[in-house]
A protein has these predicted regions:
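Short runs within selected transmembrane alpha-helices of multi-pass transporters and secretion channels
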Residues: 71, 146-165, 173-181, 206-221, ...
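Small-residue-rich hydrophobic transmembrane alpha-helices
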Residues: 50-110, 154-173, 285-351, 382-404
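Helix-terminus/linker motif at the lipid-water interface of multi-pass membrane proteins
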Residues: 29, 33-51, 120-134, 192-201, ...
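Hydrophobic/aromatic residues within transmembrane alpha-helices of membrane transport systems
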Residues: 26, 38-42, 53, 78-83, ...
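Small-residue hotspots at the loop-to-helix junctions and early N-terminal turns
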Residues: 47-58, 140, 144, 207, ...
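Generic alpha-helical transmembrane segments of integral inner-membrane proteins
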Residues: 25, 29, 33, 37, ...
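Short alpha-helical transmembrane segments in multi-pass integral membrane proteins
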Residues: 1-21, 78-150, 198-256, 313-378, ...
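Transmembrane helical elements of multi-pass membrane transporters/channels
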Residues: 19-38, 146, 180, 213-217, ...
Length: 462
């Protein structure tokens, strides 16, 4: 019984964890639920529209994760500075995030404006001149051009929301996010279908609604944060300068560059995996889109608990409470895995139901249901990997997380998917299962690294 105690916390522990995780879970859950409804709305218009939107979102996902990686590199320091009570340290990490975010956003807009067609064509295999392919390409281009207008507000929401969360404030980003997703949902309905006298815009309407919701979310976060400077102390004199001390810049670049590269290469790896699967036909792209949208709804559990590891353990490390950090981390990982066994079983049970909501072929629905079951089987694995990743990251072990995450996907997962999809007669279901199975190797590596305690360090100690 004593041996099991290290994996199980008391009631106060779980209330503390849920206090951090639940707002993130609720925000991401509502966001992903509305994304599901958005996806169904676009799916009701047609398979080509749904596939075009899915391809563009896969490409924009790379930008999203570049921003996430850019702010997370500095965020390691933000959490520990906050734990230390150093407000100026928090301000300087925010300013670093601002610089890196503006550079990445400008680069993304330039690339997507200049090379949108060849990028979308990567996912359109088969007869490039076919009517279905040309329609999917046209819808994708129209959708992307509007979505690029929404990149600046997305950036500013990430800058503020990440800093607020690293300072233990999860409610404000949650409330802003919930408001935004409902704005998105309402205007999706109006603009996609042309309700209440509005023009029927289809995929362009879906993009316009998303962009509008992002500006609403940005306005809420900025106004509420700067309107309460006593509570959010880092906002005092935040823009008095945008200079970042050279010593801190060097520290963040050393610790944070591997993290940013990790997110970028990992997102690129995921995009290439999707391209490998798309070799098996446009139906696979549509089915994967349905599966991924539904999977994201369930994935909010282990994602929120992973974020909780970064926040809770990061603050304990910054305060120098190493033994408490180690004990807390063990309990958090165990809680995440056990909870995701239950969530995965629930997801597998409802797998056949969701694809029926889409206006697509029976083949695509059947394919999507099988993909959902396969993802459900690996949910506990993903929970362990996610918690391990954030454990290592909270202690500044970003080189290790770079090897653990993005190097692995490019050296192992992508070659496996590439070879199986192009040089074997295996079904797409078998290929998908085998590619996910190689993550078990990462589980072993993650277990060893976390158990050894290589992450137990205070990176902001004077």
């Amino acid at each position: 019984m004593q041996k099991h105690r290290k994996f199980i916390g008391d009631k106060r522990f779980y209330l503390m964890v849920l206090g951090v995780a639940m707002p993130i879970m609720i925000q991401n859950g509502i966001t992903n639920f509305v994304s599901l409804l958005d996806n169904i709305m676009v799916g009701q218009v047609g398979t080509e529209q749904m596939s075009g939107v899915a391809i563009v979102n896969q490409l924009l996902f790379i930008y999203n994760l570049c921003i996430f990686g850019g702010v997370s590199g500095a965020g390691i320091f933000t959490a520990q500075y906050f734990g230390q009570g150093n407000d100026e340290g928090v301000r300087n990490t925010f300013r670093f995030k601002l610089w890196i975010g503006v550079i990445l956003t400008a680069a993304a807009i330039t690339i997507f404006l200049g090379a949108h067609e060849p990028l979308i064509r990567l996912y359109l295999t088969g007869d490039q001149g076919s009517q279905d392919m040309n329609a999917t390409l046209a819808y994708g281009i129209s959708y992307m051009k509007v979505m690029l207008v929404g990149l600046p507000p997305f950036l500013f929401v990430q800058l503020y929301a990440s800093t607020l969360r690293e300072c233990g404030e999860t409610m404000l980003p949650m409330k802003a996010g919930i408001t935004a997703v409902f704005v998105n949902l309402v205007f999706n309905y109006i603009l996609i279908y042309g309700k209440f006298g509005a023009p029927q815009l289809g995929v362009v309407g879906a993009a316009a609604a998303t962009v509008l919701s992002r500006y609403v979310e940005m306005a809420i976060v900025l106004i509420r944060t700067h309107g309460n400077k006593e509570k959010y102390r880092f906002t005092k004199h935040l823009y008095r300068t945008i200079r970042v001390p050279a010593a801190l810049t060097k520290q963040i670049l050393i610790k944070g560059t591997p993290l940013m590269l990790n997110e970028t290469f990992w997102a690129g790896g995921v995009a290439i995996l999707m391209q490998c699967y798309s070799v098996r036909g446009l139906n696979v792209v549509a089915a994967m889109n349905i599966s991924n949208t539904i999977s994201n709804l369930f994935n909010v559990v282990f994602i929120a608990l992973g974020d909780s590891v970064a926040i809770i353990v990061g603050q304990l490390l910054g305060a120098g409470r190493m033994e408490e950090a180690k004990d807390t981390d063990t309990k958090l990982i165990a809680f995440s895995v056990l909870l995701c066994i239950v969530i995965g079983a629930l997801m597998a049970l409802v797998a056949p139901l969701f694809p029926r909501l889409y206006n697509t072929t029976d083949e695509v629905r059947h394919m999507a249901a099988i993909f959902i079951v396969e993802v459900a089987m690996f949910m506990p694995v993903n929970a362990f990997l996610h918690a391990s990743y954030f454990t290592l990251r909270s202690g500044g072990k970003t080189i290790i997380t770079f090897l653990f995450d993005s190097v692995f996907i490019w050296v192992v997962s992508v070659p496996v998917a590439f070879c199986l999809s192009r040089f074997t007669g295996l079904s797409i279901y078998a290929i998908y299962f085998m590619v996910m199975s190689v993550d078990l190797i990462k589980c072993v590596i993650g277990f060893v690294l976390v158990k050894k305690g290589v992450w137990l360090q205070n990176i902001v100690a004077e």
